[in-house]
Amino acid sequence: MECVLPIKDKSDIEAMYETLREHNQRDYLLFRLAIHTGLRISTLIHLKGLDVLKQDEHCQAVNNVWRQPGISEINVPLPQSLCEELDEFMKDKGIGHDDYLFRSMKTKRPLSRQQAYRIIHDAAVQNGLSQVGLQSLRKTFAYHAYQSGTPLTVIQKYLGHQTLSETLKFIDVPQQNRTITIQLDL
């Protein structure tokens, strides 16, 4: 099995957006929602309209809250632009509360993992990216959360990892970047 990596360069992410958007809106939104939420692909492909709608029929953060008794929740809100794109997509495609968000055009059933893989892998190949697969989406989310300053322990809990080293390896942080300096001037 090939080792997949996060997509670290934001220009590569933008290129993936463009490639997928040109193919179709569903594939673009699958990718965008995946890298903005860190949801497992098995969860993503089974999302329904109700999972991304509030009662007032507007987009909300996907029901993607990590919970453990005694520990506060971790919320991952969606960017407003993504919410608007999801709203428009659902209206255009007639996706109701009980309909799958990312469904096969032929069967109206959820995309299979194999279909999702082909979508992401083909777009990556078109953009000259190697070592990109479905797990890359979750890794991309975690990597960019780490780069934006989200504490590693929060990312570890969100991903369900047992150790910090597992999380660092998952997001492909080089060993030389793993040193943390605490300097106090009391």
Regions found by a protein language model. Give the residues of each.
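Conserved catalytic core of the tyrosine transesterase superfamily
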Residues: 1-186
